Amino acid sequence: MKMKRTASSNSEAQSYNESPHSPLRFHSPLSDAGDLPESRYVSPEGSPFKIENPKSIVAGNKLTQFSPLPSPIPPPPPQFPPPRRQRNARVPMNSSSDKSPSSMVVHNSWVREDGGQTTTRKAGAPINGEESTRTTVNRARGDDLVSLTALGFRITEVILCVISFSIMAADKTQGWSGDSYDRYKEYRYCLAVNVIAFVYSAFEACDAACYIAKESYMINCGFHDLFVFSMDQLLAYLLMSASSCAATRVDDWVSNWGKDEFTQMATASIAVSFLAFGAFAVSALISSYRLFTHASS
């Protein structure tokens, strides 16, 4: 009876071990039947991975239950404090989670920088406008001052030329030793140049007054500044030449015959003619300034 019970217990144990529902057979590497389809811990056929503890898988959904990959290993906790050699080490930016925040931060910084630059340009625009307005006002004041100076020198030229040719035209003596300016070509040359300079300076004085009053010349043409500059240069050289010739004639007369009333009047006329030359030289500088300033603008 005892033998039968032992045999039956052995057969039951063997049948229990060979049973497909037995957990021993489920974990046995010698099992040929594989896992039961009804089991929760079913692994797919031909899976290259062996799951040692299937219960560790969280049953979130069917895809997670039947995943052939093992569960990810959680990262180790950080060390506090870090080792001395790692305190100054740079953290590598390899993870995808680190890339997106850094790119977003850089993008935002670019947008902010652009906005600041745009604001700076807009704020600087009125300053440039004020500077240009101030420059225009200063230029207008400078033009007015130049116009008044030019008018003053034109009036001076008119007065000096009138005095010079008037004295030369009146240089005549009576008597047996009488003499006249028209007998000497140097004096006639000086008289003619002073008359021409007087006519031109009178016309330019009227033109300058018209420009100050109406801001327009009497004769508006494209080459007005060039004409004025050329005439000022020409008459200045002519006055210098005529005055020098007349002064040479007076010096020759005084060295041979001495001083008298005739030579004294000629000397006075020549001196005023030199002063007129100085006024025309200043007018030539003013006209050259106007010419090159208007040409550059």
Swiss-Prot record:
Positions of region (Disordered): 1-135
Primary residence: membrane
Membrane topology: Multi-pass membrane protein
InterPro entries (alphabetical): CASP_dom
Localization in the cell: Cell membrane
UniProt superkingdom: Eukaryota
Annotated keywords: Cell membrane, Membrane, Transmembrane, Transmembrane helix
Extracellular topological segments: 171-191, 247-265
Pfam families, alphabetized: CASP_dom (PF04535)
Protein name listed in UniProt: CASP-like protein 4A2
